[in-house]
Swiss-Prot record:
Protein family per UniProt: Belongs to the bacterial ribosomal protein bS20 family.
Protein name as annotated: Small ribosomal subunit protein bS20
InterPro entries according to UniProt: Ribosomal_bS20 (IPR002583), Ribosomal_bS20_sf (IPR036510)
HAMAP family: Ribosomal_bS20
Known role: Binds directly to 16S ribosomal RNA.
ATP-binding is among the record's keywords: no
Keywords (A to Z) from UniProt: Ribonucleoprotein, Ribosomal protein, RNA-binding, rRNA-binding
GO MF, any single term: structural constituent of ribosome
Lineage of origin: Bacteria, Bacillati, Bacillota, Bacilli, Lactobacillales
CC terms in the record's Gene Ontology section: cytosol; small ribosomal subunit
A biological process from GO: translation
Signal peptide segment: none
């Protein structure tokens, strides 16, 4: 446990950031899973879910939660799934 006041504040700040980042990553993963499930089932709403998943991936990339190359790779794979 930190003894210095500023270090104690940083611990709180880091915990908040970790929670926010975990939530955003979870949202991204959920959006991808929803799209994959809809695509496998052949639902017409898969196109809308693809848009939502792409948006979630872009947000995670913008926030620095995932690398830009991973974001591009994930979006490319989802678009290929949609094309089939």
């Amino acid at each position: 446990m930190p003894q210095i006041k500023s270090a104690m504040k940083r611990v709180k700040t880091i915990e908040k950031a970790n929670n926010r980042n975990a939530s955003q990553l979870s949202t991204m993963r959920s959006a991808i899973k929803k799209f994959k499930a809809a695509q496998a089932a052949g639902n017409e709403e898969a196109a809308d879910l693809l848009k939502a998943a792409t948006r979630a991936i872009d947000m995670a990339s913008t926030k620095g939660l995932i690398h830009a190359n991973k974001a591009g790779r994930d979006k490319s794979r989802l678009n290929k799934m949609m094309a089939k």
